[in-house]
């Protein structure tokens, strides 16, 4: 059996587009991503505001698209793909993180899975008796659950960033499938999140023509992610067709032992869904970069108030008195609390920690992205030798953020699955 391959490269704004093309080919993506199938670029939006390390970067999305076009993939068969969560506004997020700029520049389709005429089918209709092998999803959803019909037969390229997570220690390729494959009741799986990620990988392997991941570590996030992190500039890119292996290598870079510290990696490794042992993974590209240890402290040393409460609800003393409410029409209280805490309180009060990052070359490239974008037909320019003079900015206006978060709060309450289900029953 051949070894799993993970490509690792150092990068800079001056070479990032060429680096993404080289990275993907080092990882053998053309052997995995079929040219005669639709290809979904699964964008990661962990926060609808720009925060370094939290979401798919514009140069990551742009680099992958240009690599695909350079290698002969038909742009009309490539689309960006977004899910919706009850606390994140995907439309705001794709604008604030400048992903929409990239998609529109290339003229690609932009699919929001929960909108328009998108069809969903029962998971058993898609995977058959494979569902009998699920570790936990049959218990979480005894009546089954729905997945997007369009995913069946499509390629998918995941676009995560390197960061920590308060539920899973790290998050990356495997976790990026969470929003796309599960509906808005995905929070029901949080108590068994590691087993859930393994079940979702089983589903992906059955329904997709090809599964590939391209991970951006230009910014990397430490601390109680995926939002409230301490970002660092790391200038590293990863790619692999093995979703377990790329998460293992990213975890090792951050300073974790993937088989010891990441239950979802260990479970997937033991089930032969991928390789989670770094000693058995073939690294191609920049071997020195792959040997780095960033000594991240992880998500649990300095948890936010919100993340501490989440742990108490899902795994601690509040599980019995509170968790049941998250599966009823009372659940929107948790969505409201999350939006108010993260958007109105944490974000405006913790911006000094990213000051240096915003002044980095990547921060300046982000700030100047609109005027720096290359023509969609330019597949030769390697990157941006001059990323621009001015640093990126976070939104500092407390009152405006508060007002915007109220708008997001209103949307999440209207679209909460518990409320929308009751509304559908009344109008049926």
Where are these regions (language model features)?
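N-terminal and secondary-structure boundary signal
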Residues: 1-428
């Amino acid at each position: 059996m051949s070894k799993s391959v993970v490509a690792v490269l150092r990068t800079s704004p001056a070479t990032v587009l060429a680096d993404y093309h080289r990275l993907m080919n080092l990882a053998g993506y053309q052997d995995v991503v079929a040219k005669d199938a639709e290809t979904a670029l699964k964008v990661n939006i962990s926060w609808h505001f720009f925060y370094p390390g939290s979401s798919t970067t514009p140069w990551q999305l742009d680099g992958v698209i240009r690599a695909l076009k350079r290698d002969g993939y038909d742009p009309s068969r490539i689309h960006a793909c977004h899910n919706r969560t009850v606390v994140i506004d995907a439309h705001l997020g794709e604008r604030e993180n400048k992903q929409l700029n990239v998609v529109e520049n290339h003229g690609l389709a932009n699919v929001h899975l929960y909108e328009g005429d998108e069809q969903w089918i029962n998971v058993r209709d898609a995977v058959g008796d494979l569902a009998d092998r699920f570790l936990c999803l049959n218990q979480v959803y005894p009546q089954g659950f729905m997945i997007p019909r369009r995913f069946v037969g499509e390629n998918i390229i995941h676009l995560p960033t390197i960061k920590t997570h308060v539920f899973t220690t790290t998050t990356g390729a495997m976790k990026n499938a969470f929003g796309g494959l599960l509906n808005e009741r995905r929070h029901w799986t949080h108590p068994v999140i590691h087993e859930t990620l393994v079940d979702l990988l089983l589903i992906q392997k059955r329904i997709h023509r090809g599964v590939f991941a391209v991970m951006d570590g230009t910014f990397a996030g430490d601390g109680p992610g995926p939002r409230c992190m301490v970002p660092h500039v790391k200038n590293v890119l990863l790619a692999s067709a093995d979703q377990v292996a790329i998460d293992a290598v990213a975890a090792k870079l951050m300073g974790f032992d993937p088989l010891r510290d990441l239950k979802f990696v260990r479970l997937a490794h033991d089930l032969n869904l991928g390789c989670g042992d770094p000693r058995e993974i073939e690294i191609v590209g920049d071997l020195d970069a792959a040997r780095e240890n960033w000594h991240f402290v992880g998500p649990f040393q300095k948890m936010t108030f919100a993340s501490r409460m989440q742990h108490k609800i899902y795994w601690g003393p509040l599980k019995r008195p509170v968790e049941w409410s998250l599966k009823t029409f009372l659940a929107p209280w948790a969505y409201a609390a999350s939006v108010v805490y993260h958007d109105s309180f944490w974000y405006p009060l913790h911006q000094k920690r990213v000051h240096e990052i915003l002044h980095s070359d990547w921060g300046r490239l982000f700030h100047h992205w609109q005027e720096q974008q290359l023509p969609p037909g330019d597949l030769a320019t390697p990157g941006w030798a001059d990323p621009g003079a001015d640093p990126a900015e976070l939104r500092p206006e407390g009152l405006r953020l508060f007002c915007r978060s109220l708008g997001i709060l209103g949307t999440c309450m209207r679209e909460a699955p518990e409320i929308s289900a009751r509304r559908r029953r009344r109008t049926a």
